[in-house]
């Protein structure tokens, strides 16, 4: 079990998962990343856990009530300041999450609070892991209708995650094949693009030179 850390996640991917749930359920439990067009994006921070060999992102929430499927995070003074809500966790492709560097936080007070929260999570990592696995199992079993209704559709999102990985890997592969042939040399398409760029730059230089000569003659 790797040591816990705080992570941020690609917002485009989060939006993609929300749309997948909306299409099937008519609503989504994937956390909202925006409060509205006139307001800034919501800060997203969470931990990454492996649940049934799938990486899951568990958002840190300002919600501070004890529930069966969340974990309260306490500050050094013993006060609950946030929580991990396992019914809102969602699967992510490996490598998509980025470590949230607490040292980069400009606000000193907030930086200290984040550090306290992370220390508390690390201290209780085993409990956090067990709670995540428990919630995942309970939702998949579907015996608690209220829990299922108020949780992400883990099966659906895992399939959506696989589709995201497949499509993005395919796009990367296509871009690579366009640039390089099997013998390691630049492909014809790549050479043409390079030639077009050089021709464009050369034309711009000639225009600039003509303009300079015209200005000097005036």
Segment roles from a protein language model:
Residues 1-40:
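GIY-YIG nuclease catalytic motif and its immediate N-terminal context
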Residues 10, 61, 93:
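Residues at the C-termini of beta-strands that transition into short coil/loop
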Residues 13, 64, 96:
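Residue-level detector of flexible, active-site-proximal loop/helix-junction positions
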Residues 23-26, 31, 65, 72-74, ...:
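General N-terminal targeting signals
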Residues 35, 39, 50-88:
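Compact nucleic-acid interaction/catalytic patches
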Residues 44-48:
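Short beta-strand-centered aromatic/proline hotspots
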Residues 77-180, 211:
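C-terminal terminal-subdomain/extension
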């Amino acid at each position: 079990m790797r040591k816990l850390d705080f992570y941020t996640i690609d917002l485009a991917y989060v939006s993609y998962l929300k749309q997948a749930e909306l299409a099937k359920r008519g609503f989504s439990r994937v956390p909202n990343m925006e409060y509205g067009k006139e307001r800034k994006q919501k800060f997203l921070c969470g931990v990454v856990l492996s649940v049934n060999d799938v990486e899951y992102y568990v958002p840190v929430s300002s919600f501070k009530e004890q529930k069966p499927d969340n974990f309260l995070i306490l500050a050094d003074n013993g006060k609950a300041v946030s929580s991990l809500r396992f019914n809102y966790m969602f699967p992510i492709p490996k490598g998509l999450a980025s470590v949230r560097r607490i040292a980069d936080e400009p606000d000193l007070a907030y930086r200290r609070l984040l550090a306290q929260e992370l220390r508390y999570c690390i201290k209780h990592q085993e409990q956090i892991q067990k709670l995540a696995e428990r919630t995942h199992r309970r939702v998949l079993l579907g015996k608690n209708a209220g829990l299922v209704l108020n949780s992400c559709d883990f099966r659906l999102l895992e399939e959506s995650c696989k589709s995201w990985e497949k499509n993005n890997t395919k796009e990367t592969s296509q871009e690579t094949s366009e640039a390089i042939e099997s013998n390691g040399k630049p492909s014809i398409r790549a050479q043409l693009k390079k030639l077009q760029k050089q021709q464009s730059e050369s034309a711009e230089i000639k225009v600039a030179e003509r303009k300079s000569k015209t200005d000097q003659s005036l």
